Amino acid sequence: MLLRGFSELLKCRGVMMKMRMKMSGDSSSLTLTEQQGGIRRIILNNPRKRNALSLQMLESLRENILTDADNPELHVIIISAVGPVFSSGHDLQELSSAEGSDLPRRVFHSCSELMMLIQDLPVPVIAMVNGVATAAGCQLVASCDVAVASEKSTFATPGVNVGLFCSTPAVAIGRTVPRKIAMQMLLTGRPLSAQQALQHGLLSAVFSEERLEDETLAIARRVCESSRPVVSLGKQIFNTQMSQSRDAAYSTAGAAMLDNLRLRDGQEGIRAFLEKRKPVWSNTDDCIH
């Protein structure tokens, strides 16, 4: 079954870590985490460095995402940030190290792994942006399944202005916004406003700063109302078929629909609809046959 293969992929990436996540008040922590009601919140917490995606920050984010990710009680992740900058991208000090240093390669590799992990994860990931997202920070927004922002937020890939073209951010951004908009961002480094980002598909929604958190949580809670394995399978198949030809995509999606029907929760949802009642999800990937 497609869903089980997806689960095995995550296990290989270390999902079986069984650490309990608690809110940390330590100002030295690069990220803060909390989980309640099926929603895990991961907060970038290095405003002094503009929440730069340093190697340490990338590793912290990866750990926060993977920890207990196979827990059926986890339904959705929200990534946000402390301060006026969501993330300024890579820490340029790490990229200006001495010749022969392996650090830049490790940074780029870790960043790419994180972006792919977000898309391979069995639960949706929501970016909640209230400020500036540039370079790899913009890449992080583009890599999330849903992205919402405040009206004051801006998005840019200004690497070209400092002599380092945003080639890896271009992978996520070029798959999210139209090609010519992506190239304009990459070639000029000029930012998009929140409304422009919404218009071109980088964002799912824009809210006032005052409403941003409540509206984001409302989206997350709506996700939590659905069966986790059904959502997981749907996310996996959506991402898979997007890179396929039309015929292959229909074949993949058709097989997924059959897999979905075999899920215990798939049958429960149909029965609940026919019986005019709310479904009682098992939130497990158990199959009925």
UniProtKB/Swiss-Prot annotation:
Pfam families: ECH_1
Location relative to the cell: Mitochondrion
GO cellular component: mitochondrion
Highest taxon in the source lineage: Eukaryota
GO biological process, one term: fatty acid metabolic process
One example GO MF annotation: hydro-lyase activity
Organelle targeting sequence: 1-14
InterPro entries (UniProt xref): ClpP/crotonase-like_dom_sf, Enoyl-CoA_hydra/iso, Enoyl-CoA_hydra_C, Mitochondrial_ECH-domain
Entry keyword set: Fatty acid metabolism, Lipid metabolism, Mitochondrion, Transit peptide
Family recorded in the similarity comment: Belongs to the enoyl-CoA hydratase/isomerase family.
General function of this protein: May play a role in fatty acid biosynthesis and insulin sensitivity.
Designated name of the protein: Enoyl-CoA hydratase domain-containing protein 3, mitochondrial
Gene field: echdc3
